[in-house]
Amino acid sequence: MAAVRRRERDVVEENGVTTTTVKRRKMEEEVDLVESRIILSPCVQATNRGGIVARNSAGASETSVVIVRRRDSPPVEEQCQIEEEDSSVSCCSTSEEKSKRRIEFVDLEENNGDDRETETSWIYDDLNKSEESMNMDSSSVAVEDVESRRRLRKSLHETVKEAELEDFFQVAEKDLRNKLLECSMKYNFDFEKDEPLGGGRYEWVKLNP
């Protein structure tokens, strides 16, 4: 009985060894199949640790994909599906293309902003010119008004002065005539005509030079 049990144990151990070796071979075959199925794209680079890393043109790593599967690990999720027919088109967009697109978009916005700025500057220039012309017109009108007022005041002042002078001279002339008349009556001599008057107190004799 003991010998039979030992033989059964030996058979079981041999079966276990064979099953483990078979499992290892199956795992190695699965790994080989997985490695043979994966196609490296231009933006993917293989690593030394049994995986592949997606890289852009600048060399910066973006995503990593492990190609060795284990029994406990979930299936590999394909990050980029590459079609065999159109192998030239890459599904991984590089940072240079993104930066180019972004720069072009910014350039368009800047151009539009420049156009708007030029349009608004033209409008502001027109408004400033119109305001300047209006200010110049108003200033010229104000100057003309001031000049006309000054002329009017000057003319009024001059006319008043002339009238006063005329009145003054008229009064003075009248006074002078009155005085001359009094002198003529007193001295019986006409000073305006430069000849003596008859019938007075004084007798005038003409002297020859």
From Swiss-Prot:
A Pfam entry, by short name: CDI
Post-translational modification: Phosphorylated.
Region annotated Required for nuclear localization, chain positions: 1-32
Primary location recorded for the protein, binned into one broad class: nucleus
GO CC, any one term: nucleoplasm
Subcellular location: Nucleus, Nucleoplasm
Top-level taxon in the UniProt lineage: Eukaryota
Signal sequence residues: none
Keyword Ligase belongs to the record: no
Listed Gene3D superfamilies: p27
Sample GO molecular function, one term: cyclin-dependent protein serine/threonine kinase inhibitor activity
Function: Binds and inhibits CYCD2-1/CDKA-1 complex kinase activity. Regulates cell division which is crucial for plant growth, development and morphogenesis. May regulate early lateral root initiation by blocking the G1/S phase transition. Controls the mitosis-to-endocycle transition and the onset of the endoreduplication cycle during leaf development through inhibition of mitotic CDKA-1 kinase complexes. Specifically targets CDKA-1.
Self-association state and partner proteins as the record states: Specifically interacts with CDKA-1, but not with CDKB1-1.
Other observations noted: Treatment with auxin induces lateral root initiation. ICK2/KRP2 protein abundance is regulated post-transcriptionally through CDK phosphorylation and proteasomal degradation.
Similarity section: Belongs to the CDI family. ICK/KRP subfamily.
Protein name listed in UniProt: Cyclin-dependent kinase inhibitor 2
Organism: Arabidopsis thaliana (Mouse-ear cress)
